């Protein structure tokens, strides 16, 4: 009798499974957004053959702008849960034998996640709004100015490498249980990419879940914070020069009614899921220092103000 894993991988086209045109698209997402992983939601939606290529083609010119980057900054800055700061895990990590260098590497990983998550919230907001025919750009009648339309450099920031996401099914039972417990605490459907990255340090992730995440999971403060950043993202995409996605009515010749219905649910789910993860991972970095440090764009291309 085969061993039944504690945690089953949610259906998706994972990084190592994407080849050909889809592999090229994943790399283009990496380099356009300057992020070291392709979001869980995109990997799930890539099972709908025609959607992600069409939605990305529409969004790419919009999300590669300074305006989009500023929107992600606004999301990040608003993602702090009100109330007391979480306990700093550094003493516990040092007691577990961690070196300062290892802690610095962990913090840098959190910075990479916190750079990317708000950008993915902008992305999923644009895709979800456009899917339903709501304003996801191009409807304001006012185009971006020359500063707002400046382009991000193409490619990962200097010194940043693509993340390795552990395979939940192949992880040991302790890690699988931990990923399952985090999933269930937030009523999610599967472990986020972020936790698959952080599972490389299971002792840290266990401390982080127990002391930083579990106490706020599903609280009113957490839910209000995620609602706030979803609103910021939704309002920001309306300022794009063109629609940041595709409407389901325009995909009806390439998708079955069942696929359209299924994808509608997936978009709705990830619009909330990515907001949850954005708030959670910023809180993990906040525990190491301050809200200001946790919400800072560590890979800023332009100064906060032009000049």
UniProtKB/Swiss-Prot annotation:
Signal sequence coordinates: none
Effect in UniProt of substituting residue 43 to A: Almost no effect
Family to which this protein belongs: Belongs to the HAD-like hydrolase superfamily. S-2-haloalkanoic acid dehalogenase family.
Top-level division of the source organism's lineage: Bacteria
Keyword Hydrolase included in the entry's annotation: yes
Keyword field contains Hydrolase: yes
Organism whose genome encodes this protein: Pseudomonas sp. (strain 113)
Name assigned to this protein: 2-haloacid dehalogenase, configuration-inverting
């Amino acid at each position: 009798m085969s061993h039944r894993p504690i945690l089953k991988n949610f259906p998706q086209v994972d990084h190592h499974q994407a080849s050909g045109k889809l592999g090229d698209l994943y790399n283009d997402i990496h380099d356009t957004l300057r992020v070291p992983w392709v979001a869980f939601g995109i990997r799930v939606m890539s099972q709908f053959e025609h959607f992600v290529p069409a939605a990305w083609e529409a969004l790419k010119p919009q999300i590669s702008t300074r305006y989009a980057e500023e929107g992600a900054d606004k999301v990040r800055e608003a993602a702090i849960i009100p109330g007391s700061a979480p306990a700093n895990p550094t003493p516990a990590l040092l007691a577990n034998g961690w070196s300062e260098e290892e802690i610095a590497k962990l913090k840098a990983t959190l910075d990479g996640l916190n750079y990317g998550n708000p950008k993915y919230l902008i992305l999923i907001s644009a895709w979800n709004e456009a899917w339903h025919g709501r304003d996801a750009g191009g409807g304001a009648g006012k185009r971006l100015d020359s500063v707002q339309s400046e382009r991000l450099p193409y490619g990962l920031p200097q010194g940043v490498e693509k993340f390795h996401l552990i395979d939940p099914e192949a992880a040991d039972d302790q890690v699988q249980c931990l990923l399952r417990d985090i999933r269930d605490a937030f009523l999610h459907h599967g472990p986020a990419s972020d936790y698959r990255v952080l599972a490389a340090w299971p002792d840290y992730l266990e401390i982080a879940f127990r002391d930083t995440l579990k106490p706020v999971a599903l609280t009113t403060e957490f839910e209000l914070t995620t609602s706030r950043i979803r609103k910021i993202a939704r309002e920001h995409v309306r300022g794009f020069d063109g629609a940041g996605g595709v409407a389901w009515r325009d995909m009806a010749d390439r998708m079955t009614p069942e696929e359209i219905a299924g994808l509608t649910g997936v978009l709705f789910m990830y619009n909330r899921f990515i907001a949850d993860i954005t708030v959670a991972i910023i809180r993990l970095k906040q525990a190491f220092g301050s809200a200001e440090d946790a919400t800072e764009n560590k890979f800023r291309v332009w100064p906060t103000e032009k000049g």
